[in-house]
């Protein structure tokens, strides 16, 4: 039927032309603003071509049924240019957010936070129309190019007015922050993780931009990982540092991070307790009262972490342990301190469930984590950034996982203040 109509009178041809012109304009803007690179644009273009091709077949079907149905469908497509819009942040965004976080009154601050969340949601709603045409894998791994920096005035204001609520942050001059990345890519018995190089490079770049000197160790057994952690904990630079990051990327099971010799018959696993023990206040005094952030990209089981739920309400129960009896001893010659404080662990999935990666784009968790750090760490504290990452996984998709915040013993808020 399509062959009988000329291009000049063919509504399908007109719609395809309109859609192509509109998408070309959007893609040009995305390239100009460095939102997409050439490879990403090519992948999106392939997805858009597929959608246009499928849309042509669908519209043809409507025209064969009735002329009116075709007009209705064509009208909706023709009006799509009003929906396909991107809202970019204004130049005074930083000033607005600084006002929002200025500690005046609790009610005023809360109101401004709600306003900011509304603005962010509006921007997401507009952008989502374009994202509908992007393949799932590209959506999930798209990362903002540059780290947004914190102004000097904002840094000084927060350090002064919220000194009792936040962890002390040292001045850049003389500060010797260290971060450790352990990544296992080659395994004796498990599948290799060749695409993990993307995660290593992106995490290294992020941590360096945050002021950390990054140590990278690859392809270690559990015992070798423990040895490297002990060496890192003993580094003298921690004395003149205000925090540290420990990043683990490997295969994993519920009990911990897999070493390169792991197999079911003979496990090779670095347990969480081992990590926390090495860096606790007793064994790593240089990092006492300083934030110790653990990032773990690894599966924690083989389940997908999704279920089908009904609208009926269920009842949850939990068992409780008996009360622990504590004995207090006083000694005038020493100061009592908690064995484990100032830790937070952010893991890529819930217990028993898997973590996803998408080819050479790296893992979903690491890419979302880096994206949220680049967007929000100039103004949000660490736990709020982690919640932003969790929010990005809130709606289950084809690749489903839910990052979890665990073993939190931080007593204050930790701000990174990038650029300071």
From Swiss-Prot:
Domain of life where this protein originates: Eukaryota
Entry GO MF terms: cysteine-type endopeptidase activity; cysteine-type peptidase activity; endopeptidase activity; protease binding
Top class in the EC scheme: hydrolase
Entry EC number(s): 3.4.22.-
PTM annotation (Phosphoserine): residues: 85, 90
Entry annotation: catalytic residues: 251, 299
Pfam family, one: CARD
SUPFAM superfamilies: Caspase-like, DEATH domain
Keyword Phosphoprotein tagged: yes
InterPro entries: CARD (IPR001315), Caspase-like_dom_sf (IPR029030), Caspase_cys_AS (IPR033139), Caspase_his_AS (IPR016129), DEATH-like_dom_sf (IPR011029), Pept_C14 (IPR002398), Pept_C14_caspase (IPR011600), Pept_C14_p10 (IPR002138)
Keywords recorded for this protein, A-Z: Apoptosis, Hydrolase, Phosphoprotein, Protease, Thiol protease, Zymogen
UniProt KW Membrane keyword: no
A GO cellular component entry from the record: endoplasmic reticulum
Segments for region (Disordered): 93-115
Residue stretches making up the CARD domain: 1-92
One GO BP: intrinsic apoptotic signaling pathway
Family in the record: Belongs to the peptidase C14A family.
Subunit structure: Heterotetramer that consists of two anti-parallel arranged heterodimers, each one formed by two subunits (Potential). May interact with TRAF2.
Role this protein plays: Involved in the activation cascade of caspases responsible for apoptosis execution.
Name listed for the protein in its UniProt record: Caspase-12
Native source organism of the sequence: Rattus norvegicus (Rat)
Gene name for this UniProt entry: Casp12
């Amino acid at each position: 039927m399509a062959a009988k109509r000329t291009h000049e009178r063919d509504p399908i041809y007109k719609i395809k032309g309109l859609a192509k012109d509109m998408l070309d304009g959007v893609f040009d803007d995305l390239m100009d603003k460095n939102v997409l690179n050439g490879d990403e644009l090519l992948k999106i273009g392939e997805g858009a071509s597929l959608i246009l091709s499928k849309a042509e077949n669908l519209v043809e079907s409507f025209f064969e049924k009735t002329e009116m149905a075709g007009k209705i469908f064509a009208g909706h497509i023709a009006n799509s240019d009003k929906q396909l819009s991107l809202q970019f942040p204004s130049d005074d965004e930083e000033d607005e957010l600084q006002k929002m976080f200025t500690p005046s009154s609790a009610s005023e601050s809360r109101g401004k936070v709600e306003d900011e969340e509304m603005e962010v949601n509006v921007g997401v709603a507009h952008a989502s129309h374009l994202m509908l045409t992007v393949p799932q894998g590209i959506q999930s791994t798209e990362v903002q190019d540059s780290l947004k920096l914190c102004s000097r005035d904002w840094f000084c204001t927060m350090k002064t007015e919220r000194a009792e609520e936040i962890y002390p942050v040292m001045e850049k001059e003389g500060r010797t922050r260290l971060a450790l990345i352990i990544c296992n890519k080659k395994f004796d018995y498990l599948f290799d993780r060749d695409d993990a190089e993307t995660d290593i490079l992106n995490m290294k770049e992020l941590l360096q931009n945050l002021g950390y000197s990054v140590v990278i160790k690859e392809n270690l057994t559990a015992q070798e990982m423990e040895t490297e952690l002990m060496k890192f904990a003993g580094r003298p630079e921690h004395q003149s540092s205000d925090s540290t990051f420990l990043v683990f990327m490997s295969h994993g099971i519920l009990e911990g991070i897999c070493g390169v010799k792991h197999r079911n018959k003979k496990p090779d696993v670095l347990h969480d307790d081992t990590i926390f023990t090495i860096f606790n206040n007793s064994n790593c005094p240089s990092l006492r009262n300083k934030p110790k952030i653990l990032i773990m990209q690894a599966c924690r089981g083989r389940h997908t972490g999704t279920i089908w739920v009904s609208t009926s309400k269920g009842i949850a129960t939990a068992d409780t342990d008996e009360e622990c009896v504590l004995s207090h001893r006083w000694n005038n010659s020493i100061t009592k301190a908690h064995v484990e404080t100032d830790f937070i662990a952010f893991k890529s999935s819930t217990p028993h469930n898997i973590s996803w990666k998408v080819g050479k784009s790296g893992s979903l968790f690491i890419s979302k984590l880096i994206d949220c750090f680049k967007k929000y760490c100039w103004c949000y504290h660490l736990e709020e950034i982690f919640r932003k990452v969790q929010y990005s996984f809130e709606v289950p998709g084809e690749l489903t996982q839910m990052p979890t915040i665990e073993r939190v013993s931080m007593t204050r808020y930790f701000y990174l203040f990038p650029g300071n």
